[in-house]
Design a protein with these regions (language model features):
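Mature extracytoplasmic domains of secretory-pathway proteins
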Residues: 31-95
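Residue-level detector of solvent-exposed, low-hydrophobicity positions
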Residues: 22, 51, 57, 67, ...
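Bacterial signal peptide processing site
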Residues: 16-19
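C-terminal motif of bacterial Sec signal peptides marking the signal peptidase cleavage site
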Residues: 11-14
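Alpha-helical transmembrane signal-anchor/signal-peptide segments
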Residues: 21-32
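Positively charged n-region of N-terminal signal peptides that target proteins for export
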Residues: 1-5
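C-terminal partner/receptor-binding element of secreted or periplasmic proteins
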Residues: 95-124
């Protein structure tokens, strides 16, 4: 019985934290959609403890405005954030800083401790 209790405690401790998210409504981007390119690789750690990297040269299309910033969807590829579940994620940038993610399947915003992102604006 004691071994079963220890196994149960270890199992519960091994579960990942849920990705923090709050409801969010995407609004039209002022000035219309644009594309940016990340000019320098960005590495960061999510609140759940998982690491992610946004590659230099990756391109992102502005999809909408949130109170926290502008949501950018990857032009080619998919970005995910992970906790207890894996979520498709779009970057949310505010003034050259990555401030979180828009989770399109959940219509939600997930905040991040801000990280500086160097970008080049591309018109397409």
């Amino acid at each position: 019985m004691k071994a079963l209790l220890i196994c149960a405690v270890l199992f519960l401790c091994a579960c990942s934290a849920e990705v923090v998210r709050q409801p969010a409504e995407l609004r039209k981007v002022p000035g219309g959609p644009s594309v940016i390119e990340v000019s320098k690789q960005v590495k960061f750690t999510l609140a759940t403890g998982y690491d992610r990297t946004v590659a230099a040269g990756s391109r992102w299309r502005a999809m909408g405005q949130l109170p926290a910033g502008i949501a950018y969807k990857p032009v080619n590829g998919v970005l995910t954030v992970e906790g207890a579940h894996v979520h498709e994620a779009w970057l949310v940038l505010d003034g050259g800083r990555l401030v979180g993610f828009y989770l399109p399947a959940d219509n939600a915003f997930s905040p991040l401790n801000p990280v500086q992102v160097e970008t080049i604006k591309r018109e397409e």
